[in-house]
């Protein structure tokens, strides 16, 4: 089984559930109650392993702060990103403009294809909470893959399972692009 690594930047406005998602995916403890929200200072990195077909993939989630206070770090954090997961609060569709800024700062410098980018609307819900309804993106980013996931911080397993059903598509797209770039670099070396 071939082993690969992927760097996925997880970006979006503050308080959209980026850290909750990353911690739940990495099976890390999730804080509840008054301490449940702790703003990310620059970046947090979580790692997971997935098997995609015949490939074992070690995924690093770079959970990037949504605060403009850390915007000067974005070029460094965006360096050599293999994929981009943009997170939005489905109850705040005006955040789509913010996602366009993240796209320009993380996807465009890395020449990412649409298959390497995804928008995920995360509904942070309490026990018995409803899913609500998200209409999807309306602007320039509507060409990207979009998903909607509800995560209950007290019991995130169902939300994690739903998230993986979408994220595996992102991982496969990022892995395919990485393999193609590697093959292209080998071909260019042989031509010299």
From Swiss-Prot:
Protein location: Cell projection, Cilium, Flagellum
Keywords for this protein: Cell projection, Cilium, Flagellum, GTP-binding, Nucleotide-binding
Annotated binding of GTP, by residue: 12-19, 62-69
InterPro entries assigned to the protein according to its UniProt record, in alphabetical order: P-loop_NTPase
Gene Ontology cellular component list: motile cilium
Pfam family, one: Roc
Record has Nucleotide-binding as a keyword: yes
GO molecular-function term, one example from the UniProt record: GTP binding
Primary location recorded for the protein, binned into one broad class: other
Record family assignment: Belongs to the small GTPase superfamily. Rab family.
Quaternary structure note: Component of the IFT complex B, composed of IFT88, IFT70, IFT52, IFT46, IFT27, IFT25 and IFT22.
Function field: Component of the intraflagellar transport (IFT) complex B. Functions in regulating the cellular pool size of both complex A and complex B and thus plays a critical role in determining the cellular availability of IFT particles.
Protein name: Intraflagellar transport protein 22
């Amino acid at each position: 089984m071939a082993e690969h690594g992927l760097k996925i930047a997880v970006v979006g406005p503050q308080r959209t559930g980026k850290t909750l998602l990353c911690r739940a995916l990495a099976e890390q403890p999730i804080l509840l109650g008054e301490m449940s929200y702790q703003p990310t200072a620059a970046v947090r990195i979580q790692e997971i392993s997935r098997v995609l077909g015949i490939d074992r993939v070690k995924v690093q989630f770079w959970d990037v702060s949504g605060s403009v206070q850390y915007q000067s770090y974005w070029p460094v954090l965006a360096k050599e990103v293999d994929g981009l997961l943009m997170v939005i609060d489905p109850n705040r569709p005006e955040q789509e403009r913010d996602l366009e800024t993240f796209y320009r700062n993380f996807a465009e410098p890395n020449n990412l294809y649409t298959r390497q980018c995804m928008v995920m609307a995360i509904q942070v819900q309490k026990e018995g909470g409803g899913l609500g309804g998200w209409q999807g993106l309306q602007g320039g980013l509507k060409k990207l893959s979009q998903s909607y996931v509800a995560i209950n911080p007290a019991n995130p397993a169902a939300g994690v399972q739903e998230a993986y059903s979408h994220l595996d598509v992102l991982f496969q797209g990022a892995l395919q692009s990485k393999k193609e770039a590697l093959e292209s670099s080998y071909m260019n070396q042989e031509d010299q």
